[in-house]
C-alpha cells in the first residue's frame, strides 16, 4: 500500500527535512533584518504659498515653490492682507521630492496624508461637520528643466475633524486646532523623477464652499514610499522562490499523475495552493521599473487574496478529509458550509478593494472614507468579511477538535495490535498532529511578528548591529509561507514505497477484525492514505 511520503518517512529523515526548512526560515528573517533597509520611508513636506494674481486663474500655469522659475510667494497669510491678496489667489505648492533629490521607480508607490494647520479666530470658527474643498492638480516631469505635464486634476473634498482644547476666548486667538490627519493621495507607481502638487482652496460664499473651515495657515503633507533597497531585496526573494515552488509543484503533480487512480480532493487542493503561491511569487514587479503600471498595488492585493482564500480552504479540507465518511469525502460540495464564508468574505474584501484602489487608478485623490455613504459602505463590507472570518474559525476549531477526538478514540485500539503495526500507526498519528501544530505555529508567528512590527520603533540595536524588525517581518513571513507550501507538496506527495504483503499479513500480525476495521476504505491499490483509513471508522461510529 503506497501512502504519502510523510507516512513512509522515518523520524530521522523527517527531522532532517524539518531542520533544513528551519535553516531557510532563519535565513529569510536574517535577509530582512540584516541586509534590507526599512520597508518604507516617510518624508514631511511643507507647502509654499504661491500667489496667482492673474484674472480667472488660468489652470495651465504651474506654480513651483523653488528653483529658477519659482513662483511669487508669501511667508504667511498675514502678509496677504496688506498686499490685498484674496484666498482664491493663493496656491499651496509642494514639490516632490525635496531639493537636490529624485524619485525612483524602485520606490514602487507613493502614499500621502494631509495635515491642516488651522488657527482659531472668534469670527471664523470651524463649523460642525465642516468640509474643506480643495482644487488639486498633479504634474510630473523627468528633467529639471522640462515642462510640467498634468497627471491629474480633481476637486478633493475632505471632512474636518478638529477640536480646540483651550477656551474660545479672545486671548486664545491664534492657537491651532487639533485636527485629524486626512487621506490625500495614493499612486501605485513612481515612474517619474519629479512631481508637483498645486492645491487651491477656492472660496464661494454663495455656494457655501470653504466657508466655516477656520483660518488655514499652512498645509503639510507626509509622503510615504517603499525604500529602493528593500524593493531590490524583495524582488530578489521573489526571483529565487518562484522557480523553487514551481519545480516542487511540477514534481508533486507528476507523482500524482503516475498513480493508477485519479487525484483525490486533498491532493488537488494542495496543488491549487502551490499554484496560488507561485502566482504570488512571479516577480512581475520587475516590469514596474520600466513601465508606468499604476495597477500593481491592486494586482498585488488580488494575488494575496487568492492565496489566503486557498490557504483557508486547504485547512478546512485537510481536517475534513480526516473525519468524513467515504460518501462525503473527496467532493468539494461536502464543504460548502465551511468554504462558503471564505468565498463571501473574499468577495466582500475584493469589492472593497475595487471601490478604493480600483477608483484610484483614474483618480489618485479618491478615498472611500471621505464621504458618509462611502464610509458606511466600506464598514459594511469589512463587517461582513469579519463575520465570515469568525464563522470560518469556528468551523475550523470544531473540525480540528473532531479530528483529534477521532484519533484519540482510535488510539484505544492500538494496544491490541502487534508492536510493529502499533508503532506504525502511532507514527502516523504523530505526523498528523505535528502538521497541525506546525500550522498553528505558522499562524501564531504571523500574528506575533505583525504585532511586534506595529509596537516597536522599526529596528533594534544590539551593539553595533542594527536589526530592521519590519523588514524581517515581511521577508520572514513571506519565506515562511513559501516553506510551508513547499513542505506540504513534498511531504504529501504520493510515496513510491510499498508495504509488502508479508508485512501486511505476517509481521504486523493483526487480528482479522482489526484488519477489517482499518482497511475498510481501501478501494484499490493506490487508495486513500493510511491516516484516512485509521480515522474514517471512528467518524462513522
From Swiss-Prot:
<comment type="similarity">
    <text>Belongs to the wntless family.</text>
</comment>
<comment type="subunit">
    <text>Interacts with WNT3A. Interacts with WNT1, WNT3 and WNT5A.</text>
</comment>
<dbReference type="GO" id="GO:0005789">
    <property type="term" value="C:endoplasmic reticulum membrane"/>
</dbReference>
<keyword id="KW-1003">Cell membrane</keyword>
<feature type="transmembrane region" description="Helical; Name=3">
    <location>
        <begin position="269"/>
        <end position="289"/>
    </location>
</feature>
<feature type="topological domain" description="Lumenal">
    <location>
        <begin position="353"/>
        <end position="380"/>
    </location>
</feature>
<feature type="topological domain" description="Cytoplasmic">
    <location>
        <begin position="325"/>
        <end position="331"/>
    </location>
</feature>
<feature type="transmembrane region" description="Helical; Name=6">
    <location>
        <begin position="381"/>
        <end position="401"/>
    </location>
</feature>
<keyword id="KW-0968">Cytoplasmic vesicle</keyword>
<feature type="topological domain" description="Cytoplasmic">
    <location>
        <begin position="493"/>
        <end position="541"/>
    </location>
</feature>
<dbReference type="Pfam" id="PF21883">
    <property type="entry name" value="WLS_GOLD"/>
</dbReference>
<feature type="topological domain" description="Cytoplasmic">
    <location>
        <begin position="402"/>
        <end position="431"/>
    </location>
</feature>
<keyword id="KW-0256">Endoplasmic reticulum</keyword>
<dbReference type="GO" id="GO:0031901">
    <property type="term" value="C:early endosome membrane"/>
</dbReference>
<dbReference type="InterPro" id="IPR009551">
    <property type="entry name" value="Wntless"/>
</dbReference>
<feature type="topological domain" description="Lumenal">
    <location>
        <begin position="37"/>
        <end position="232"/>
    </location>
</feature>
<dbReference type="GO" id="GO:0009948">
    <property type="term" value="P:anterior/posterior axis specification"/>
</dbReference>
<feature type="transmembrane region" description="Helical; Name=7">
    <location>
        <begin position="432"/>
        <end position="452"/>
    </location>
</feature>
<dbReference type="GO" id="GO:0000139">
    <property type="term" value="C:Golgi membrane"/>
</dbReference>
<keyword id="KW-0472">Membrane</keyword>
<dbReference type="InterPro" id="IPR047843">
    <property type="entry name" value="WLS-like_TM"/>
</dbReference>
<feature type="transmembrane region" description="Helical; Name=8">
    <location>
        <begin position="472"/>
        <end position="492"/>
    </location>
</feature>
<feature type="region of interest" description="Interaction with Wnt proteins">
    <location>
        <begin position="101"/>
        <end position="232"/>
    </location>
</feature>
<dbReference type="GO" id="GO:0006886">
    <property type="term" value="P:intracellular protein transport"/>
</dbReference>
<dbReference type="GO" id="GO:0031410">
    <property type="term" value="C:cytoplasmic vesicle"/>
</dbReference>
<feature type="transmembrane region" description="Helical; Name=4">
    <location>
        <begin position="304"/>
        <end position="324"/>
    </location>
</feature>
<comment type="function">
    <text>Regulates Wnt proteins sorting and secretion in a feedback regulatory mechanism. This reciprocal interaction plays a key role in the regulation of expression, subcellular location, binding and organelle-specific association of Wnt proteins. Also plays an important role in establishment of the anterior-posterior body axis formation during development.</text>
</comment>
<feature type="transmembrane region" description="Helical; Name=2">
    <location>
        <begin position="233"/>
        <end position="253"/>
    </location>
</feature>
<keyword id="KW-0967">Endosome</keyword>
<dbReference type="GO" id="GO:0017147">
    <property type="term" value="F:Wnt-protein binding"/>
</dbReference>
<dbReference type="GO" id="GO:0016055">
    <property type="term" value="P:Wnt signaling pathway"/>
</dbReference>
<dbReference type="GO" id="GO:0061355">
    <property type="term" value="P:Wnt protein secretion"/>
</dbReference>
<keyword id="KW-0217">Developmental protein</keyword>
<dbReference type="GO" id="GO:0005794">
    <property type="term" value="C:Golgi apparatus"/>
</dbReference>
<feature type="topological domain" description="Cytoplasmic">
    <location>
        <begin position="254"/>
        <end position="268"/>
    </location>
</feature>
<protein>
    <recommendedName>
        <fullName>Protein wntless homolog</fullName>
    </recommendedName>
</protein>
<dbReference type="InterPro" id="IPR053936">
    <property type="entry name" value="WLS_GOLD"/>
</dbReference>
<keyword id="KW-0879">Wnt signaling pathway</keyword>
<feature type="transmembrane region" description="Helical; Name=1">
    <location>
        <begin position="16"/>
        <end position="36"/>
    </location>
</feature>
<keyword id="KW-1133">Transmembrane helix</keyword>
<feature type="topological domain" description="Lumenal">
    <location>
        <begin position="290"/>
        <end position="303"/>
    </location>
</feature>
<keyword id="KW-0333">Golgi apparatus</keyword>
